[in-house]
């Protein structure tokens, strides 16, 4: 790698040739502010906040896209630079809805933080004509409020990176705004509800629909029995809402907080994940042994499922018919558990705590009501739970560690790793390989399918039969693999697809980290590492060994793939138009 010698604020530095001034400054421990930059996703220099002085240049340059070269002298904090940044912030605010006190991003807004750093007041020096701002709340999962949009185009780039591109910059000049094609509302386009636009937005222009008031109303209703269950990844991300290190496992404190919020029972979605694996492994083995449609593709990610329904409606038979762990958990709670406890399912309210905004859409899907009532009534994001805990005055960090309630609080290590890309595949392999071979696995770690790469392939020989698998995360990568499946060049037997890059640990409902952190820290790897540690410490690490799952089959379902299991745990899919 060729190196060049530069100076930043008179400090000599040797850096790789061709990197941006922004990256070079970071290597020197200097943070240059930005509002639009997302590494390898949105590198367009649009916001003009990152302007710096370069000796010999006639004007300020954008640090995020300007490459360094030999002998360059850069100044990041001169009076000229600071004045430019402050003026730019004032211009942004001139058309901004400055209702910061009630904004969902107050305290985590990157624009708000920069205005504070550069002493920008609220007098509106450049206030003038204001455009009409669109407010779109048509979608089940999120709201777009263009009054808070700063045209950074991060959401557009995130949507493009997902190979969706349902939002973009419309019109020109002063009338430029972010919107859907043909100015249609979000519920009328092929948005898959993944929420990657939300976690990348620097302001409150895009955010999830908040269902916490409805959940609190149910908790306070004496006629309702309110049950909550939490997805595998939540235990290693919720702590970030309270300033804890990325990847801190707060499972015990999370359970304690949920009890203090007033939920009648606190269950673990990991139970549903174990159940999903048992059913999914049985379905996979059936397809392999009976000449069924292959490759079989996982169905845990609702963003991926909606993508498939919009973009590959002729390939829905490749999808596993298994419901997701969220929906399986809800279905079991309102059938088997309700029966055991003598509670009418109409009086049970099931709340899922999920890393995912698409889970909100999933609760409204067809064929998701095994008891005659919705399997899951409300799905809250990690962020919504964080806000509930904070508003209840609960000191999260000081809570004691508590255990989940049984019987749906019992789970295995295989379920914990669902939150990482490759986790579903690894969990399924632990069960499927044992069932195929009839022998106990010597090693439970299928490391070939781990890691944050977008596409991973592996092959295993079991009883003389080669099983080829593929693990995919991010919908752009899903598109690549689905094209291979479509044209017959994919020789896989089993494919795991997660809608969000890196899987659920990077879901659209997870805590929003500042872009500086997202650009220079691998959130996905840190969060996933905590899940693998949790798996390693579990007494049982194979889903089919779960005592709670065994009990469910013995008392209620019969056997994997039974008629009863299909009634309660399986679903179907529908072709969806791209526009309506």
Label the model's feature ranges.
Residues 1-2:
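Terminal leader/tail segments of proteins
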Residues 5, 12, 17-77, 81, ...:
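Iron-sulfur-associated redox domains of electron-transfer enzymes in respiratory
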Residues 5-8, 97, 139-142, 181-183, ...:
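A short, structure-level motif marking secondary-structure boundaries and short turns
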Residues 48-193, 206-221, 225:
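Fe-S ferredoxin-like electron-transfer domains
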Residues 196:
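Basic (Lys/Arg-enriched) interaction patch that binds polyanionic ligands
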Residues 199:
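Conserved glycine-bearing catalytic or ligand-binding loops at nucleotide- and phosphate-handling centers
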């Amino acid at each position: 790698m060729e190196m060049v010698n530069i100076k930043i604020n008179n400090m000599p530095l040797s850096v790789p040739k061709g990197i941006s001034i922004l990256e070079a400054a970071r290597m020197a421990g200097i943070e240059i502010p930005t509002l639009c930059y997302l590494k390898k996703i949105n590198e367009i220099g649009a916001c003009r906040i990152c302007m710096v002085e370069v000796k010999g240049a006639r004007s300020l340059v954008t640090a995020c896209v300007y490459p360094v070269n030999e002998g360059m002298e850069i100044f990041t904090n001169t009076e000229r630079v600071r004045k430019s940044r402050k003026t730019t912030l004032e211009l942004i605010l001139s058309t901004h809805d400055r209702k910061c006190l009630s904004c969902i991003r107050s305290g985590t807004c990157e624009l708000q933080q920069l205005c504070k750093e550069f002493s920008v007041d609220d007098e509106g020096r450049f206030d003038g004509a204001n455009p009409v701002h669109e407010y779109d709340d048509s979608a089940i999962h999120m709201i777009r409020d263009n009054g808070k949009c700063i045209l950074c185009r991060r959401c557009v780039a995130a949507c493009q990176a997902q190979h969706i591109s349902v939002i973009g910059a419309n019109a020109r000049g002063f009338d430029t705004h972010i919107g859907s094609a043909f100015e249609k509302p979000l519920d009328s386009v092929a948005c898959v509800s993944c929420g990657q636009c939300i976690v990348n937005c620097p302001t409150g222009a895009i955010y999830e629909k908040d269902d916490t008031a409805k959940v609190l109303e149910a908790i306070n209703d004496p006629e309702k029995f309110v049950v909550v269950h939490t997805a595998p990844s939540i235990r290693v991300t919720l702590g970030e809402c309270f300033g804890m290190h990325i990847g801190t496992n707060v499972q015990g404190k999370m359970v304690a907080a949920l009890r203090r919020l007033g939920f009648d029972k606190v269950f673990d979605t990991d139970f549903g994940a174990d159940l999903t694996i048992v059913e999914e492994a049985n379905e996979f083995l059936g397809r392999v042994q009976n000449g069924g449609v292959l490759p079989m593709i996982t169905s845990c990610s609702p963003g991926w499922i909606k993508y498939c329904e919009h973009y590959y409606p002729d390939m829905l038979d490749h999808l596993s018919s298994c419901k997701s762990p969220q929906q399986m958990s809800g279905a079991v709670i309102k059938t088997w558990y309700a029966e055991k406890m003598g509670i009418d399912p109409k009086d049970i309210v099931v709340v899922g705590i999920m890393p995912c905004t698409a889970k909100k859409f999933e609760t409204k899907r067809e064929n998701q009501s095994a008891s005659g009532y919705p399997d899951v009534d409300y799905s809250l994001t990690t962020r919504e739970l964080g806000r509930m805990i904070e508003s209840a005055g609960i000191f999260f960090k000081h809570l004691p560690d508590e255990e989940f309630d049984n019987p749906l609080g019992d789970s295995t290590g295989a379920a914990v790793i669902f939150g990482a890309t490759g986790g579903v595949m690894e969990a399924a392999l632990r069960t499927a390989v044992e069932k195929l071979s009839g022998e106990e696995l010597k090693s439970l770690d299928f490391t070939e399918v781990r890691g944050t790469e977008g596409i991973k392939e592996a092959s295993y020989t079991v009883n003389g039969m080669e099983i080829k698998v593929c693990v995919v995360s991010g919908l752009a990568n899903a598109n690549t693999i689905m094209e291979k499946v479509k044209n017959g060049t994919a020789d896989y037997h089993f494919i795991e697809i997660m809608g969000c890059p890196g899987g659920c640990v990077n879901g659209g409902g997870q805590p929003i980290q500042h872009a500086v952190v997202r650009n220079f820290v691998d959130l996905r790897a840190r969060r996933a590492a905590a899940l693998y540690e949790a798996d390693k410490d579990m007494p049982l690490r194979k889903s089919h060994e779960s005592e709670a799952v065994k009990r469910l089959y013995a008392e209620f379902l019969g056997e994997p793939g039974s008629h009863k299991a299909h009634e309660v745990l399986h679903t179907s899919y529908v072709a969806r138009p791209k526009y309506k």
